[in-house]
């Protein structure tokens, strides 16, 4: 994973090979997490949500521009789940998902379960971004201590996410159902894919 925001630096050793593998116009999109894994020389070994403020936004914009220069295209930026509210934030999460694409000129990989889990865990109302959503991820999680939701990609897609998908889907978005373990019978996974496809089809036909 390449660091693109909170440290103010990018990782050329990651982006260089990616540029060599990039097959040009045949690739619809590539993505990176809107997160950091190290700062000040300290590696934390986990995706961490950066402070949602103008300092982070400026560093992110610089690094996205550098990624665009090296690879030729900018990544879609994926929102992450967090169990800790990022300190020093001046934007709400939903505001952040609107200002990041405008500041960087790139699009969002909107992970609906990450946003759903954060909203449940921190008690905010979801306002879905309407601009520059280039890809959508669906996944599931589980309830942990104190009623919080852990985004573990090991459970079925919650019903609420299909309603969110219907609100944000358009004809161009790529939708991916993620599952990283605790696999059910394959037919159940296919049913989630079919449900997502039908949700998008119905939503787009009503525009």
Predicted segments with their positions:
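Active-site beta-loop-alpha junctions enriched in small/polar residues
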Residues: 1-3, 33-35, 80-82, 113-117, ...
């Amino acid at each position: 994973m390449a660091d693109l925001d909170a440290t103010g630096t990018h990782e050329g050793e990651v982006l260089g090979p990616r540029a060599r593998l990039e097959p040009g116009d045949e690739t619809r999109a590539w993505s990176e997490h809107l997160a950091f894994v190290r700062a000040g020389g300290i590696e934390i070994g986990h995706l961490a949500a950066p402070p949602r403020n103008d300092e982070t936004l400026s560093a992110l914009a610089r690094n996205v521009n550098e990624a665009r220069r090296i690879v030729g295209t900018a990544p879609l930026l994926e929102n992450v789940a967090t169990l800790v509210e990022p300190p020093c934030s001046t934007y709400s999460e939903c505001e952040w998902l609107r200002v990041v694409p405008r500041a960087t000129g790139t699009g969002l990989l909107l992970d609906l379960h990450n946003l759903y889990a954060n909203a449940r865990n921190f008690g905010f109302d979801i306002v879905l971004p309407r601009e520059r959503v280039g890809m959508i991820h669906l996944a599931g999680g589980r309830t942990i201590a104190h009623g919080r939701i852990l985004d573990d990609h090991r459970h079925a897609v919650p019903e609420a996410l299909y309603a969110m998908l219907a609100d944000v889907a358009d004809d161009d978005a790529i939708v991916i159902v993620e599952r990283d373990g605790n696999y059910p019978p394959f037919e159940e996974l296919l049913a989630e894919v079919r449900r997502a496809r039908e949700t998008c089809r119905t939503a787009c036909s009503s525009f």
